[in-house]
Amino acid sequence: MFHGIKKSDVKELTEEEKAKNELQLKKLKAIQDQILKIRDKNTYEQKSMEFLLKSSVLMPDYPTLWTIRKILIEQHLPNLKDEEAMEFLIKEIKSILPIMMKNPKSYLLWYHRIWCLVKCIEIEIKKGTELEKSVLIGEIGLCNKFFLKDDRNFHCWNYRVKILSLISIYFQSTFQKFVKEELEFTIEKVTVNFSNFSAWLYRSKLIPIYFVQHNIKWNTKEALDFFKDDLELIKKAIYTDPKDQSPWNYLSWIITNFSPMYIKSINLDENNLLIIKYSNVFKIESLLEIFGEEKNYKLLNKEEFSSEIKIQLNNSENWGEEKIIIQNKNIDKVKIGFDGLSLVTNKICFTKENLSLPTITISKSKEGKLIYNIEMNNVKDFQLEFLQKQLDEINELIKLSPDFFIENGHVHLAELYKIFYQIRRRNADLKEKAEEDKKNEIAQLKLLQEKSKRMNNMYSTILKIEETDN
Protein backbone atom coordinates (compact mmCIF):
# COMPACT_ATOMS: atom_id res chain seq x y z
CA MET A 1 0.00 0.00 0.00
CA PHE A 2 1.20 3.53 -0.81
CA HIS A 3 -1.04 6.41 0.34
CA GLY A 4 -3.94 3.99 0.33
CA ILE A 5 -3.27 2.71 -3.20
CA LYS A 6 -2.37 -0.95 -3.66
CA LYS A 7 0.78 -1.77 -5.58
CA SER A 8 0.50 -3.97 -8.63
CA ASP A 9 1.40 -7.62 -8.20
CA VAL A 10 4.88 -8.56 -9.46
CA LYS A 11 4.78 -11.47 -11.87
CA GLU A 12 7.57 -14.02 -12.13
CA LEU A 13 9.93 -13.65 -15.12
CA THR A 14 10.12 -16.26 -17.86
CA GLU A 15 13.45 -17.88 -18.83
CA GLU A 16 13.51 -15.80 -22.01
CA GLU A 17 13.02 -12.60 -20.02
CA LYS A 18 15.75 -13.60 -17.57
CA ALA A 19 18.21 -14.19 -20.44
CA LYS A 20 17.32 -10.83 -21.94
CA ASN A 21 17.95 -9.16 -18.60
CA GLU A 22 21.36 -10.82 -18.35
CA LEU A 23 22.40 -9.33 -21.69
CA GLN A 24 21.10 -5.92 -20.63
CA LEU A 25 23.06 -6.18 -17.38
CA LYS A 26 26.31 -6.86 -19.26
CA LYS A 27 25.64 -3.86 -21.49
CA LEU A 28 25.02 -1.62 -18.50
CA LYS A 29 28.18 -2.89 -16.81
CA ALA A 30 30.23 -1.86 -19.84
CA ILE A 31 28.61 1.59 -19.78
CA GLN A 32 29.30 1.88 -16.07
CA ASP A 33 32.99 1.11 -16.62
CA GLN A 34 33.20 3.86 -19.23
CA ILE A 35 31.48 6.34 -16.90
CA LEU A 36 34.03 5.58 -14.18
CA LYS A 37 36.85 6.25 -16.67
CA ILE A 38 35.33 9.67 -17.35
CA ARG A 39 35.23 10.26 -13.61
CA ASP A 40 38.89 9.30 -13.20
CA LYS A 41 39.94 11.54 -16.11
CA ASN A 42 38.01 14.44 -14.52
CA THR A 43 38.23 16.69 -17.58
CA TYR A 44 35.40 18.43 -19.42
CA GLU A 45 35.11 17.12 -22.98
CA GLN A 46 32.15 17.37 -25.32
CA LYS A 47 32.33 13.67 -26.19
CA SER A 48 32.22 12.77 -22.49
CA MET A 49 29.12 14.92 -21.98
CA GLU A 50 27.44 13.33 -24.98
CA PHE A 51 28.25 9.83 -23.70
CA LEU A 52 26.85 10.64 -20.24
CA LEU A 53 23.64 12.03 -21.71
CA LYS A 54 23.21 9.03 -23.99
CA SER A 55 23.92 6.68 -21.07
CA SER A 56 21.34 8.42 -18.88
CA VAL A 57 18.61 7.14 -21.20
CA LEU A 58 19.47 3.60 -20.06
CA MET A 59 20.61 4.52 -16.53
CA PRO A 60 18.50 7.51 -15.39
CA ASP A 61 18.83 6.58 -11.71
CA TYR A 62 22.58 6.01 -11.59
CA PRO A 63 23.82 8.63 -9.05
CA THR A 64 27.47 8.52 -10.15
CA LEU A 65 26.52 9.53 -13.69
CA TRP A 66 24.73 12.69 -12.58
CA THR A 67 27.38 13.57 -10.00
CA ILE A 68 30.10 13.40 -12.66
CA ARG A 69 27.98 15.45 -15.05
CA LYS A 70 27.55 18.19 -12.45
CA ILE A 71 31.29 18.21 -11.69
CA LEU A 72 32.13 18.60 -15.39
CA ILE A 73 29.55 21.35 -15.83
CA GLU A 74 31.02 23.27 -12.89
CA GLN A 75 34.47 22.89 -14.46
CA HIS A 76 33.22 24.28 -17.77
CA LEU A 77 31.07 27.23 -16.63
CA PRO A 78 33.97 29.51 -15.50
CA ASN A 79 35.34 29.32 -19.06
CA LEU A 80 32.16 30.85 -20.47
CA LYS A 81 30.82 34.39 -20.51
CA ASP A 82 27.62 34.92 -18.54
CA GLU A 83 25.42 34.86 -21.66
CA GLU A 84 27.16 31.72 -22.92
CA ALA A 85 26.87 30.02 -19.53
CA MET A 86 23.16 30.82 -19.39
CA GLU A 87 22.67 29.43 -22.89
CA PHE A 88 24.64 26.30 -21.94
CA LEU A 89 22.48 25.66 -18.85
CA ILE A 90 19.20 26.24 -20.69
CA LYS A 91 20.37 23.74 -23.30
CA GLU A 92 21.21 21.28 -20.50
CA ILE A 93 17.73 21.69 -19.01
CA LYS A 94 16.12 21.07 -22.40
CA SER A 95 18.33 18.07 -23.15
CA ILE A 96 17.11 16.04 -20.18
CA LEU A 97 13.40 16.69 -20.79
CA PRO A 98 12.88 13.72 -23.17
CA ILE A 99 14.55 11.46 -20.59
CA MET A 100 12.30 12.87 -17.86
CA MET A 101 9.20 12.20 -19.96
CA LYS A 102 10.21 8.53 -20.13
CA ASN A 103 11.22 8.43 -16.45
CA PRO A 104 8.82 10.84 -14.68
CA LYS A 105 9.56 9.37 -11.25
CA SER A 106 13.33 9.65 -11.25
CA TYR A 107 14.65 11.55 -8.23
CA LEU A 108 17.95 12.30 -9.96
CA LEU A 109 16.42 13.79 -13.10
CA TRP A 110 14.18 16.18 -11.17
CA TYR A 111 17.07 17.14 -8.93
CA HIS A 112 19.38 17.79 -11.90
CA ARG A 113 16.78 20.05 -13.45
CA ILE A 114 16.38 22.24 -10.36
CA TRP A 115 20.18 22.24 -9.91
CA CYS A 116 20.61 23.71 -13.41
CA LEU A 117 17.86 26.24 -12.75
CA VAL A 118 19.57 27.44 -9.56
CA LYS A 119 22.83 27.79 -11.51
CA CYS A 120 20.97 30.07 -13.92
CA ILE A 121 19.77 32.18 -11.00
CA GLU A 122 23.32 32.40 -9.62
CA ILE A 123 24.46 33.86 -12.94
CA GLU A 124 21.66 36.44 -12.90
CA ILE A 125 22.56 37.42 -9.32
CA LYS A 126 26.19 37.82 -10.39
CA LYS A 127 25.09 40.08 -13.26
CA GLY A 128 22.79 42.04 -10.96
CA THR A 129 19.75 41.14 -13.05
CA GLU A 130 16.67 38.99 -12.50
CA LEU A 131 15.74 35.70 -14.08
CA GLU A 132 12.82 36.17 -16.44
CA LYS A 133 9.56 35.36 -14.69
CA SER A 134 8.46 33.36 -17.72
CA VAL A 135 11.20 30.79 -16.99
CA LEU A 136 9.76 29.88 -13.58
CA ILE A 137 6.15 30.08 -14.76
CA GLY A 138 7.21 27.80 -17.60
CA GLU A 139 8.39 25.25 -15.04
CA ILE A 140 4.93 25.35 -13.42
CA GLY A 141 3.48 24.69 -16.88
CA LEU A 142 5.86 21.76 -17.26
CA CYS A 143 4.53 20.28 -14.01
CA ASN A 144 1.00 20.60 -15.36
CA LYS A 145 1.99 18.55 -18.42
CA PHE A 146 3.41 15.81 -16.21
CA PHE A 147 0.21 15.84 -14.14
CA LEU A 148 -1.78 15.02 -17.27
CA LYS A 149 -0.01 11.65 -17.25
CA ASP A 150 -0.04 11.14 -13.48
CA ASP A 151 -1.54 13.75 -11.16
CA ARG A 152 -0.17 11.87 -8.12
CA ASN A 153 3.50 12.10 -9.18
CA PHE A 154 5.03 13.29 -5.90
CA HIS A 155 8.41 13.95 -7.59
CA CYS A 156 6.69 16.55 -9.73
CA TRP A 157 4.80 17.97 -6.75
CA ASN A 158 8.08 18.31 -4.82
CA TYR A 159 9.61 20.11 -7.79
CA ARG A 160 6.62 22.45 -7.87
CA VAL A 161 7.25 23.34 -4.20
CA LYS A 162 10.84 24.26 -5.06
CA ILE A 163 9.67 26.48 -7.92
CA LEU A 164 7.18 28.06 -5.52
CA SER A 165 10.09 28.88 -3.21
CA LEU A 166 12.02 30.56 -6.02
CA ILE A 167 9.00 32.62 -7.05
CA SER A 168 8.51 33.72 -3.43
CA ILE A 169 12.04 35.15 -3.40
CA TYR A 170 12.46 36.66 -6.85
CA PHE A 171 8.93 37.79 -7.67
CA GLN A 172 7.48 38.94 -4.35
CA SER A 173 5.18 41.51 -5.98
CA THR A 174 3.16 38.80 -7.73
CA PHE A 175 3.68 36.00 -5.19
CA GLN A 176 0.42 36.66 -3.34
CA LYS A 177 -1.60 36.27 -6.54
CA PHE A 178 0.38 33.14 -7.41
CA VAL A 179 -0.36 31.50 -4.03
CA LYS A 180 -4.09 32.14 -4.51
CA GLU A 181 -3.95 30.54 -7.96
CA GLU A 182 -2.04 27.55 -6.60
CA LEU A 183 -4.65 27.04 -3.87
CA GLU A 184 -7.34 26.96 -6.55
CA PHE A 185 -5.21 24.49 -8.51
CA THR A 186 -4.98 22.10 -5.54
CA ILE A 187 -8.76 22.13 -5.16
CA GLU A 188 -9.10 21.22 -8.83
CA LYS A 189 -6.73 18.29 -8.39
CA VAL A 190 -8.23 16.81 -5.22
CA THR A 191 -11.76 17.23 -6.60
CA VAL A 192 -10.81 15.12 -9.61
CA ASN A 193 -8.90 12.60 -7.50
CA PHE A 194 -9.53 12.37 -3.76
CA SER A 195 -6.54 10.01 -3.48
CA ASN A 196 -4.09 12.70 -4.57
CA PHE A 197 -2.03 12.73 -1.37
CA SER A 198 0.56 15.13 -2.78
CA ALA A 199 -2.09 17.69 -3.76
CA TRP A 200 -3.52 17.65 -0.23
CA LEU A 201 0.00 18.00 1.19
CA TYR A 202 0.89 20.87 -1.17
CA ARG A 203 -2.30 22.64 -0.09
CA SER A 204 -1.25 22.32 3.55
CA LYS A 205 2.04 24.06 2.66
CA LEU A 206 0.30 26.89 0.80
CA ILE A 207 -2.33 27.74 3.41
CA PRO A 208 0.12 28.96 6.12
CA ILE A 209 1.70 31.25 3.51
CA TYR A 210 -1.74 32.52 2.46
CA PHE A 211 -2.63 33.23 6.10
CA VAL A 212 0.53 35.29 6.59
CA GLN A 213 -0.13 37.24 3.39
CA HIS A 214 -3.69 38.08 4.49
CA ASN A 215 -2.91 38.54 8.20
CA ILE A 216 -5.13 35.63 9.23
CA LYS A 217 -4.36 34.21 12.67
CA TRP A 218 -4.58 30.48 13.30
CA ASN A 219 -7.23 29.25 15.69
CA THR A 220 -9.59 32.14 15.01
CA LYS A 221 -13.10 32.07 13.59
CA GLU A 222 -11.79 33.74 10.43
CA ALA A 223 -9.24 30.95 9.93
CA LEU A 224 -11.83 28.24 10.51
CA ASP A 225 -14.21 29.87 8.01
CA PHE A 226 -11.45 29.55 5.41
CA PHE A 227 -11.64 25.75 5.76
CA LYS A 228 -15.42 25.54 5.29
CA ASP A 229 -15.21 24.25 1.69
CA ASP A 230 -12.21 22.07 2.54
CA LEU A 231 -14.14 20.30 5.29
CA GLU A 232 -17.09 19.64 2.99
CA LEU A 233 -14.73 18.23 0.36
CA ILE A 234 -13.01 16.03 2.96
CA LYS A 235 -16.36 14.72 4.14
CA LYS A 236 -17.34 13.86 0.58
CA ALA A 237 -13.97 12.16 0.01
CA ILE A 238 -14.19 10.08 3.20
CA TYR A 239 -17.75 8.98 2.50
CA THR A 240 -16.73 8.07 -1.07
CA ASP A 241 -13.85 5.87 0.10
CA PRO A 242 -13.20 5.60 3.87
CA LYS A 243 -10.11 3.48 3.12
CA ASP A 244 -8.31 6.34 1.38
CA GLN A 245 -5.87 7.83 3.90
CA SER A 246 -5.19 11.07 1.96
CA PRO A 247 -8.27 13.05 3.11
CA TRP A 248 -7.93 11.54 6.61
CA ASN A 249 -4.39 12.92 6.89
CA TYR A 250 -5.48 16.36 5.69
CA LEU A 251 -8.36 16.33 8.19
CA SER A 252 -5.91 15.46 10.98
CA TRP A 253 -3.76 18.42 9.95
CA ILE A 254 -6.74 20.79 10.19
CA ILE A 255 -7.89 19.35 13.52
CA THR A 256 -4.39 19.72 14.98
CA ASN A 257 -4.25 23.37 13.98
CA PHE A 258 -7.58 24.13 15.63
CA SER A 259 -7.14 22.06 18.77
CA PRO A 260 -6.00 23.53 22.10
CA MET A 261 -2.62 22.26 23.17
CA TYR A 262 -2.69 19.76 26.01
CA ILE A 263 -0.16 17.83 28.06
CA LYS A 264 0.24 14.21 26.99
CA SER A 265 2.50 13.12 29.85
CA ILE A 266 4.68 14.30 32.73
CA ASN A 267 7.52 12.03 33.87
CA LEU A 268 10.32 12.33 36.43
CA ASP A 269 13.05 9.69 36.23
CA GLU A 270 15.48 8.48 38.92
CA ASN A 271 18.06 11.05 37.77
CA ASN A 272 15.64 13.91 38.45
CA LEU A 273 15.10 14.56 34.74
CA LEU A 274 11.62 16.00 34.24
CA ILE A 275 10.06 15.59 30.79
CA ILE A 276 6.75 17.26 29.90
CA LYS A 277 5.28 16.17 26.56
CA TYR A 278 2.73 18.33 24.76
CA SER A 279 0.31 17.54 21.96
CA ASN A 280 1.79 20.15 19.62
CA VAL A 281 5.10 21.72 18.66
CA PHE A 282 5.90 25.16 20.09
CA LYS A 283 8.83 27.55 20.27
CA ILE A 284 11.32 26.59 23.00
CA GLU A 285 13.26 29.86 22.86
CA SER A 286 10.43 31.80 24.50
CA LEU A 287 10.62 29.55 27.59
CA LEU A 288 14.01 31.04 28.47
CA GLU A 289 12.24 34.25 29.51
CA ILE A 290 9.93 32.25 31.76
CA PHE A 291 12.63 30.31 33.58
CA GLY A 292 15.02 33.24 34.04
CA GLU A 293 17.85 32.63 36.50
CA GLU A 294 18.57 29.02 37.33
CA LYS A 295 17.63 27.96 40.86
CA ASN A 296 16.84 24.34 41.58
CA TYR A 297 16.25 23.49 37.94
CA LYS A 298 17.81 23.86 34.50
CA LEU A 299 16.10 23.93 31.10
CA LEU A 300 17.91 21.44 28.84
CA ASN A 301 16.18 22.06 25.50
CA LYS A 302 18.60 23.20 22.80
CA GLU A 303 16.38 22.96 19.71
CA GLU A 304 14.30 25.87 18.44
CA PHE A 305 11.00 23.99 18.14
CA SER A 306 9.85 20.97 20.12
CA SER A 307 6.79 19.24 21.54
CA GLU A 308 8.43 18.53 24.89
CA ILE A 309 10.24 20.36 27.68
CA LYS A 310 13.26 18.79 29.39
CA ILE A 311 14.16 20.07 32.84
CA GLN A 312 16.99 18.86 35.07
CA LEU A 313 16.00 19.15 38.73
CA ASN A 314 18.81 19.62 41.25
CA ASN A 315 18.91 17.44 44.35
CA SER A 316 17.69 19.45 47.31
CA GLU A 317 15.84 18.59 50.48
CA ASN A 318 14.07 21.93 50.29
CA TRP A 319 13.07 21.63 46.65
CA GLY A 320 9.43 21.76 47.65
CA GLU A 321 9.90 25.45 48.45
CA GLU A 322 10.48 26.18 44.76
CA LYS A 323 7.94 26.08 41.97
CA ILE A 324 8.27 26.03 38.21
CA ILE A 325 5.46 27.87 36.46
CA ILE A 326 5.26 27.34 32.71
CA GLN A 327 2.84 29.53 30.83
CA ASN A 328 2.29 30.64 27.28
CA LYS A 329 4.47 33.55 26.18
CA ASN A 330 5.13 32.42 22.63
CA ILE A 331 5.08 34.76 19.67
CA ASP A 332 4.10 34.07 16.08
CA LYS A 333 6.98 33.15 13.85
CA VAL A 334 6.70 32.06 10.24
CA LYS A 335 9.70 31.28 8.08
CA ILE A 336 9.46 31.12 4.32
CA GLY A 337 12.96 30.49 3.10
CA PHE A 338 15.10 29.08 0.34
CA ASP A 339 18.45 27.58 1.26
CA GLY A 340 20.24 25.95 -1.63
CA LEU A 341 17.80 23.38 -2.95
CA SER A 342 15.66 23.08 0.17
CA LEU A 343 11.89 23.28 0.06
CA VAL A 344 9.75 26.15 1.23
CA THR A 345 9.82 25.96 5.02
CA ASN A 346 6.84 27.02 7.09
CA LYS A 347 7.35 26.93 10.84
CA ILE A 348 4.44 28.26 12.82
CA CYS A 349 4.86 28.95 16.49
CA PHE A 350 1.65 28.87 18.49
CA THR A 351 0.43 31.79 20.61
CA LYS A 352 -2.29 32.18 23.20
CA GLU A 353 -4.43 33.52 20.36
CA ASN A 354 -3.36 30.49 18.36
CA LEU A 355 -3.00 27.33 20.45
CA SER A 356 -3.37 27.33 24.20
CA LEU A 357 -0.27 26.12 26.05
CA PRO A 358 -1.55 24.88 29.41
CA THR A 359 -0.25 26.62 32.52
CA ILE A 360 1.55 24.16 34.79
CA THR A 361 2.59 24.61 38.39
CA ILE A 362 5.13 21.92 39.32
CA SER A 363 6.63 21.27 42.73
CA LYS A 364 8.42 18.41 44.44
CA SER A 365 7.76 17.29 47.99
CA LYS A 366 10.51 16.44 50.49
CA GLU A 367 9.61 12.80 49.99
CA GLY A 368 10.53 13.19 46.32
CA LYS A 369 6.99 12.96 44.98
CA LEU A 370 6.22 15.07 41.91
CA ILE A 371 3.26 17.39 42.45
CA TYR A 372 1.70 19.41 39.65
CA ASN A 373 -1.44 21.23 38.68
CA ILE A 374 -2.53 21.86 35.10
CA GLU A 375 -4.92 24.55 33.95
CA MET A 376 -6.01 24.86 30.32
CA ASN A 377 -6.95 28.38 29.27
CA ASN A 378 -8.24 30.14 26.18
CA VAL A 379 -10.42 27.32 24.86
CA LYS A 380 -12.93 29.09 22.64
CA ASP A 381 -16.53 28.15 21.93
CA PHE A 382 -15.95 27.88 18.18
CA GLN A 383 -13.11 25.41 18.86
CA LEU A 384 -15.41 23.14 20.86
CA GLU A 385 -18.16 23.44 18.24
CA PHE A 386 -15.73 22.58 15.45
CA LEU A 387 -14.26 19.57 17.26
CA GLN A 388 -17.70 18.36 18.33
CA LYS A 389 -18.92 18.52 14.73
CA GLN A 390 -15.95 16.45 13.54
CA LEU A 391 -16.56 13.92 16.30
CA ASP A 392 -20.27 13.67 15.43
CA GLU A 393 -19.53 13.15 11.74
CA ILE A 394 -16.98 10.42 12.44
CA ASN A 395 -19.42 8.69 14.78
CA GLU A 396 -22.04 8.89 12.03
CA LEU A 397 -19.60 7.24 9.64
CA ILE A 398 -19.08 4.44 12.16
CA LYS A 399 -22.80 3.73 12.08
CA LEU A 400 -22.95 3.73 8.28
CA SER A 401 -19.78 1.74 7.65
CA PRO A 402 -18.18 0.30 10.83
CA ASP A 403 -15.93 -2.18 9.02
CA PHE A 404 -14.38 0.48 6.79
CA PHE A 405 -13.91 2.82 9.72
CA ILE A 406 -12.22 0.29 11.98
CA GLU A 407 -9.49 -0.26 9.40
CA ASN A 408 -8.93 3.41 8.58
CA GLY A 409 -10.43 6.05 10.82
CA HIS A 410 -9.87 4.79 14.35
CA VAL A 411 -6.66 6.78 14.89
CA HIS A 412 -8.44 10.03 14.08
CA LEU A 413 -11.31 9.20 16.43
CA ALA A 414 -8.84 8.41 19.21
CA GLU A 415 -7.12 11.75 18.72
CA LEU A 416 -10.43 13.61 18.89
CA TYR A 417 -11.41 11.76 22.06
CA LYS A 418 -8.09 12.65 23.69
CA ILE A 419 -8.44 16.33 22.77
CA PHE A 420 -11.98 16.53 24.09
CA TYR A 421 -11.20 14.76 27.32
CA GLN A 422 -8.21 17.00 28.05
CA ILE A 423 -10.22 20.17 27.36
CA ARG A 424 -13.03 19.09 29.65
CA ARG A 425 -10.77 17.92 32.47
CA ARG A 426 -8.90 21.25 32.49
CA ASN A 427 -11.95 23.52 32.49
CA ALA A 428 -13.92 23.73 35.72
CA ASP A 429 -17.28 24.33 34.03
CA LEU A 430 -16.79 21.25 31.81
CA LYS A 431 -15.39 18.76 34.34
CA GLU A 432 -18.75 17.28 35.26
CA LYS A 433 -19.65 16.76 31.63
CA ALA A 434 -16.21 15.25 31.01
CA GLU A 435 -16.91 12.19 33.15
CA GLU A 436 -20.28 11.57 31.50
CA ASP A 437 -18.87 11.96 27.99
CA LYS A 438 -15.89 9.76 28.78
CA LYS A 439 -18.22 6.93 29.80
CA ASN A 440 -20.08 7.23 26.50
CA GLU A 441 -16.86 7.44 24.50
CA ILE A 442 -15.34 4.39 26.18
CA ALA A 443 -18.58 2.49 25.58
CA GLN A 444 -18.24 3.37 21.89
CA LEU A 445 -14.63 2.17 21.89
CA LYS A 446 -15.57 -1.11 23.55
CA LEU A 447 -18.19 -1.68 20.87
CA LEU A 448 -15.63 -1.13 18.14
CA GLN A 449 -13.02 -3.16 20.00
CA GLU A 450 -15.18 -6.25 19.73
CA LYS A 451 -14.96 -5.97 15.94
CA SER A 452 -11.22 -5.59 15.55
CA LYS A 453 -8.01 -6.28 17.50
CA ARG A 454 -6.59 -3.08 16.04
CA MET A 455 -8.86 -1.15 18.40
CA ASN A 456 -6.94 -2.41 21.46
CA ASN A 457 -4.23 0.24 21.24
CA MET A 458 -6.78 2.99 20.75
CA TYR A 459 -8.84 1.81 23.72
CA SER A 460 -5.83 1.61 26.04
CA THR A 461 -4.63 5.05 24.90
CA ILE A 462 -7.89 6.68 25.95
CA LEU A 463 -7.87 4.93 29.32
CA LYS A 464 -4.30 6.04 30.00
CA ILE A 465 -5.28 9.68 29.72
CA GLU A 466 -6.24 9.61 33.38
CA GLU A 467 -2.61 8.92 34.29
CA THR A 468 -1.83 12.48 33.21
CA ASP A 469 -4.41 13.81 35.63
CA ASN A 470 -3.45 11.79 38.70
Task: Locate predicted features.
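Residue-level recognition of tetratricopeptide repeat
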Residues: 48, 62, 105-106, 152-153, ...
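A conserved position within tetratricopeptide repeats
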Residues: 2, 39-42, 52-60, 73, ...
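Boundary/linker elements of alpha-helical solenoid repeat scaffolds
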Residues: 28-36, 73-80, 121-128, 164-172, ...
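Eukaryote-skewed repeat-based solenoidal scaffolds used as protein-protein interaction platforms
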Residues: 93-103, 110-241
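Extreme N-terminal leader/anchor segments
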Residues: 1-64, 71-81, 85-90
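Structured C-terminal portions of repeat-based eukaryotic scaffold domains
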Residues: 208-470
